[in-house]
Amino acid sequence: MTVVVLGCKIHGDRPSRMLHARLEAAAEFLLEHPQSHCIVTGGQGADEDYPEAYVMKNYLVDKGISPMRIVTESRSTSTLENITFSAEMAEIYNCHERFLIVTDRFHQYRAMRTANDLGIVSYALNVETAWYLAMPYWFREMAAITRDWITS
């Protein structure tokens, strides 16, 4: 199984609270499953100093995950690109074709649906988000799901 950690906002060279939770969940899984590889996926936002994927990889390495197990995908700017580019990286690096997608519960439906639409067998590793952080993102997700439904 290839662990795919979806990117999220960073602050300088540190993950945001939400990204921190995703990375903690991924690190725990990777430490318990040493045969699994990981793809960290996330580009660089206009207000970010680095691509999210670089910060994510550094965090996991600091947690004891070998850098040889981590593939960095730093071009993506959307959920669709996260999954699409991760699938490309999995093929290039001969990672397992099944994905364990690590993201917040509010984001998991769209991430899993995207993977399914691309023909990728995937499983969810949900991360809980504090309600006061999650509320605006739930509305954003509903808008994104509606947009995807209209444009598909």
Regions from the PLM with identified roles:
Residues M1-W138:
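A structural signal for short, hydrophobic/glycine-enriched beta-strand patches
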Residues A134-S152:
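A transmembrane-helix-recognition feature enriched in membrane-embedded lipid enzymes
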